[in-house]
Every structure is written in C-alpha cells, then in structure tokens.
Amino acid sequence: MRIFRFVKIVFTVIRFGLDEVMLSRIENPRVKLLLRITTIGRRFADPPAVRLRRALESLGPIFVKFGQVLSTRRDLLPVDFANELAKLQDQVPPFDSAVAIAIVEKSLGARIDVLFDEFERVPVASASIAQVHFAKLKQGEHKGKAVAVKVLRPNMLPVIDSDLALMRDIATWAERLWADGRRLKPREVVAEFDKYLHDELDLMREAANGSQLRRNFAGLDLLLVPEMFWDYSTPAVLVMERMTGVPISQVDTLRAAGVDIPKLAREGVEIFFTQVFRDGFFHADMHPGNIQVSLDPKHFGRYIALDFGIVGALSDFDKNYLAQNFLAFFKRDYHRVATLHLESGWVPPDTRVEELESAIRAVCEPYFDRALKDISLGQVLMRLFSTSRRFNVEIQPQLVLLQKTMLNVEGLGRSLDPELDLWKTAKPYLERWMTEQIGLRGWYERFKVEAPQWSKTLPQLPRLVHQALISHHEAPRAISDDLIRQILVEQRRTNRLLQALLVFGLAVGAGAVIARVLIVLAYGG
C-alpha cells in the first residue's frame, strides 16, 4: 500500500514540476542528473509556489493539513511559498450521516433519539479530521439546549500513520540530498506535524482547550467561547454550545447591522494581547473561518471563537522575551535586541553580539521609514526570526506559532480598519507586563509562588555545599555535572529569596517611616 502511495507522490511531483524547484537545491550529482532528464521539454505557466499548493491539494487532506502547518513556518519558507500555502482550504466532502450517527451512539452509549431531541443529518461543516452537525439536547439540566456535535472521521488513524511514515522517509532523504536540508530541518517539521495531527484526533483535548479559553475570558466583555458539555464528549465526539453569528469576513453585513467596525478591530487586537501577556495561552487558529461576531442583543458586537484544535502556550520567559524585544525594537535599541537573543540561551556561545546587532539593524531599520501605525509586529518578529536563523539561533516552536497567529490577527484587524494602530494597542500590554515583572508587585507575586519550595530546599543548601566540598577534596575532577547543576539551582533560588526579602523589608521599612511622618504631622509628635 505504501509503495503505491509513494509512486503517486513521485508522479505528482513530476506532474506539477516540483522536480524543477528541487533541481536548484540538490547537491548529489547523480540525483541532479536524473532530475535534469525529467525536466527536459517541460514548461509551466504557474509559479513554483502555486504548483506546490496544487500538488498538495491533489494528494489529499493530510497533505493539505501539512501545507497549512508548513505555512506557519515563515521562519523557514520563502515569503511567496508561505503566502501561497496559507490559501490551502481544509474542506472535503462530508462522510455519510448514518456513519456519523453510529459513531455518536457507540461513543456515548445510547441511541441518537435518546440523546437528542433533534439531530440534523446534513452537516454544517466538513473538514479532513471531523464534521459538525447541529442538534438539541434531550436530557438533564441542559434539556432543549442547542448544541454543535463534532464527529471524528472514521478510520483516520491508519491513513494518517501511513502518510506520516512516507513524510518521514521523504524528510530523511531531503535532509541528505538538499542543500538547505540541515538548515530547514525537515524531519523536525514532520515530527511537529505528527504531534499536531495526533492532537487533533483527540476531541477531548480540543474541549479542554475551549474550556480553558472560556474560563480565561469569563467576566470580560470581549470574547464569547462555547460551553463544553463533558457528559456528551469523548475522544471521537465533542458536544458544545451552539453559537451563531456573522463571519468576521462579512464586513458589509456587520456594518449594516450597526456594529462599530473600528471598535471591533481594536478589540480583536486586545483579545490577542490579553491571551498572550495576561494568560500565556492563546487561540492559534484565528483565521476568519473560526471567528464570528454576535448580533444577539445580549452580546451585540462581541467576538465568538470557534475551533480550539490549535492553541499555544507561553512561559513567563517567553513573554519577557517578546515584551523586551518589541520595546527595544521601537526604541531602535538593536544592541539590546541582540543581547536579549544571547540571554535567551538559544544562541551558540561563540556568537559575537556586535555581528548579531549589525544583522538585526539591517533588517529592522527600514521599518522606520513608515509611520508606527503601519508597522506589522508579526512581520517584525518574522524578520527577527529569519535573521536569528542565520546565526543558528534555535527559535522555539511556540514563538513561531505566536508569530503566525499575530500575522492573522493583524490581517484581520486591518481588513476591518485600515487605520488600525497596532503598536498603540499593544504598547500598554507590553509596558504593563514589564511593570508587573520588574516592580514590587512582581517581586511579591514571585515570592508567594516560590516561598513553599524555598522553605523546603533552603535547609538542604549547607548539606549540598558540604557534599560538594568533600567530593572535590576526595576527587577534584570527579564532581558530577548533576551535583553542580543542583547547587547552582539552589544558589539561584537563594538569591531570589534574598532579593525578595530585601525588597519586602525595604517596603515594610518605608511604610513604617511614612506612617511615622504622618503621625507626626497629624499629632505634632
């Protein structure tokens, strides 16, 4: 079976002239000669990027998905290829509704007419992984509730595993034969896609993502997220609250309904930066197909988020990296940008900060020929990542995913309001983050988090130091790396504790002095 699939892939490559694209990048002389023979006498009207998109479409939904994921790696691909792959649509004909009903009944352990008052047999949406039916719940406290039922396609795993095995083989050969193979790391890209695809095959994971996002925005008048019904959800079936709205792309319809379009554009950016800098958890598939706007009088003009299969998570370190880079960029402090890359630990130790600074200046300085409101933060990140790649900087996958999402959000915002000033909207979030991290509040919050661990580990520090000294005396060259790392970790924790105690003590002391002055002023001593 795999051999036939492989033959089809080879013929597709030749049919769309992708061997011509490969020819210029292949190093092996024999393979290069073979490719020259296959390209004799052929002419193609479409550019290579378009031919790649069409080839992936002809190979089926799994390769379409791969192209979509590949389009997010703008740090690896030329701009024209990334833009063309972003046009790939994950739309396939629906599977038989009788099969969908059978999957629901098997997964939930009851007949469809016992579970639902109504179940629309014609799906409202169909993609490569699942399709969606509208229904109404029949039982319990949610009786009569309108829901959307997402059903996983049957027998997907064998197809996916077969195609992934071929992709791994192709990636291995590409890494050996292609001039850019090592730099582009095709095996890592396929491994990333493997994880992403298998995550999508578990609808409980998507439900958990949606539930987290809903909880994060509870009480904020910004974003509506459907409620997940856990009693009706399994890895193969997801039942969530049905929400209806107007697709964000239908701007004329929204304007005619009375929606404030410039406000909508600003709030879209606010939602994104709230997810990034407050929550460290963001919806990473915010294209127009997954975003609607409510016209319900109760929630008029609010965003509705759908499809939670792809999310990103950021650590405090990631958020600090982003905030400081953006602030340094807009101050044109390229030395600081270069230093931040070195401090991240993702740069080879022999990298010269002056060379990195010069390269960053060369790609960033041209942005300042335009107004601040016209600068794309996503493009800035993309250029920084591309420059970093030349210095063998290992850009973290979550930051690449964030950059792709940021481009989507910017495109969405500017399609609504071409005058949208992204920097004006983003700057307060960046400055608030830095204030909270560096200021007294940040120290206090970190002290609360770390205090229990410190109280447990601090008493062990003298023993660890003693052990290290004894070991060094008995075998000067035999101190284990693990022990050294452990000592350094404890030392850093101790330093943080002492710093926090110092700040806390200064704050208490300052408070006491101020209180004393107020008493003197009020009562005359």
UniProtKB/Swiss-Prot annotation:
The chain crosses the membrane at residues 501-521. Residues 118-500 form the Protein kinase domain. It is found in: Cell inner membrane. Its EC number is 2.7.-.-. One of its GO terms (cellular component) is plasma membrane. Keywords: ATP-binding, Cell inner membrane, Cell membrane, Kinase, Membrane, Nucleotide-binding, Transferase, Transmembrane, Transmembrane helix, Ubiquinone biosynthesis. InterPro entries: ABC1_dom, Kinase-like_dom_sf, UbiB, UbiB_bact, UbiB_kinase. Belongs to the ABC1 family. UbiB subfamily. Is probably a protein kinase regulator of UbiI activity which is involved in aerobic coenzyme Q (ubiquinone) biosynthesis. This is Probable protein kinase UbiB. It comes from Burkholderia mallei (strain ATCC 23344).
